[in-house]
Swiss-Prot record:
Leading EC class: lyase
Gene Ontology biological process terms from the UniProt entry: 2-deoxyribose 1-phosphate catabolic process; carbohydrate catabolic process; deoxyribonucleotide catabolic process
Active-site residues, as the UniProt record annotates them: D89, K154, K183
Metabolic or biological pathway, per its Swiss-Prot or TrEMBL entry: Carbohydrate degradation; 2-deoxy-D-ribose 1-phosphate degradation; D-glyceraldehyde 3-phosphate and acetaldehyde from 2-deoxy-alpha-D-ribose 1-phosphate: step 2/2
Name this protein carries in UniProt: Deoxyribose-phosphate aldolase
Pfam families to which the protein is assigned, alphabetical: DeoC
Gene: deoC
Keywords: Cytoplasm, Lyase, Schiff base
Biological source species: Thermoanaerobacter pseudethanolicus (strain ATCC 33223 / 39E)
GO molecular function, one term: deoxyribose-phosphate aldolase activity
Length: 223
């Protein structure tokens, strides 16, 4: 197993600098990560550094609260794609989900999916922010995400009170089935953490510790 190809090398902190993003992109090229996951203002920079590689540019939409309007999420997603992003991680509207307004939740995902996929094979991941949800809400969010035409469910923003757990990843995988993406993010800091998430059903890992995870994995010759 090539662990690097399962990692979205991530830097989303609000005080990230251009030089830190450049370092992130260089590390992604060196290690062969699946993507870099960055804030929207850095998409141009990342694209300029990675356009001749197989490392994807991933950005976040409605981040980190997910409370933006549908229209603003669509605009933000399309703008990112026009600038070179080929993967977008959108935060689900947790308030609407917990209010039981499932039509709204499904519609917002559908609208973003429809808008970005008109530009090509853009991967859409939906961040559930599982730390705020009951198990029943996690299942419903997974079902809505799949029905709406997205490509992945993702556990967390990394900005909430909790991150990915083995139990949540198992539940998400069980709900979406085999032919769908599950991304574990938040609190995945070591190769052992990554291995546990993959064994639970994740096929993508979001982590700011991508280099550490990859080096530990290779050193331990994990499979």
């Amino acid at each position: 197993m090539n662990i690097a190809k399962m990692i979205d090398h991530t830097l989303l902190k609000p005080n990230a600098t251009k030089s830190e993003i450049e370092k992130l992109c260089n590390e992604a090229k060196e290690y062969g990560f699946a993507s870099v996951c960055i804030n929207p203002c850095f998409v141009d920079l990342a694209y300029s550094m990675l356009k001749d590689t197989d490392v994807k540019v991933c950005t976040v939409i409605g981040f980190p609260l997910g409370a933006n309007t549908i229209e603003s999420k669509v605009f933000e997603a399309v703008d990112a794609v026009k600038r070179g992003a080929t993967e977008v991680d959108m935060v689900l509207n947790v308030s609407m989900l917990k209010s039981g307004d499932y039509d709204y939740v499904k519609k917002e995902i559908e609208e973003v999916v429809k808008a970005v996929k008109s530009y090509g094979d853009i991967v859409v991941k939906v961040i559930l922010e599982t730390c705020y949800l009951t198990d029943e809400e996690k299942v419903k969010a997974c079902q809505l995400t799949r029905e709406a035409g997205a490509d992945f469910v993702k556990t967390s923003t990394g900005f909430g009170p909790g991150g990915a757990t083995v139990e949540d990843v198992k539940l998400m995988r069980q709900t979406v089935g085999e032919n769908f993406g599950v991304k574990a993010s938040g609190c995945v800091r070591t190769a052992e953490d990554a291995k546990a998430m993959i064994e639970a059903g994740a096929n993508r890992i979001g982590a700011s510790a991508g280099v550490k995870i990859a080096e530990e994995w290779n050193k331990l010759k994990m499979s």
